C-alpha cells in the first residue's frame, strides 16, 4: 500500500509539470492581445511573434 501512495504522488507531480497541462495565461504573457496557436497561424491570421515553445502569436490583420 505504501508503494501505491508513492506512485500516485509521482503521477500527480508529473501531471503538474507537463507542458501540455500548463496554464494558458503564461503563454499570453508573451503574446500581447493575440492568441497562441501551435505551429503556424491559421490562414485568416498573421504571425506577429512567438509564444512559449513551438506556438505562434497570431493576430487579426487589422489589429497588428
Curated annotation (Swiss-Prot):
Gene Ontology cellular component terms for the protein in this record: extracellular region
Pfam families: Defensin_beta (PF00711)
Presence of the UniProt keyword Disulfide bond in the record: yes
InterPro entries: Defensin_beta-like
Top-level taxon in the UniProt lineage: Eukaryota
Coiled coil: none
Tissue expr: Expressed in circulating heterophil granulocytes and bone marrow (at protein level).
Cysteines engaged in disulfide bonds, as pairs: 31-57, 36-51, 41-58
Signal peptide range: 1-28
Subcellular location(s) of the protein: Secreted
Keyword Signal part of the UniProt annotation: yes
Any one biological process term the GO annotation gives: defense response to bacterium
Alphabetic keyword roster: Antibiotic, Antimicrobial, Defensin, Disulfide bond, Secreted, Signal
Stated role: Antibacterial activity against the Gram-positive bacterium Staphylococcus aureus.
Family stated for the protein in its record: Belongs to the beta-defensin family.
Protein name: Antimicrobial peptide THP2
Species of origin: Meleagris gallopavo
Amino acid at each position: 500500500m505504501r508503494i501505491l501512495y508513492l506512485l500516485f504522488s509521482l503521477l500527480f507531480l508529473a501531471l503538474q509539470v507537463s507542458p501540455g497541462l500548463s496554464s494558458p495565461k503564461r503563454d499570453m504573457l508573451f503574446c500581447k492581445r493575440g492568441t497562441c496557436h501551435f505551429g503556424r497561424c491559421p490562414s485568416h491570421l498573421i504571425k506577429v511573434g512567438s509564444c512559449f515553445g513551438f506556438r505562434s502569436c497570431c493576430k487579426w490583420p487589422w489589429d497588428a
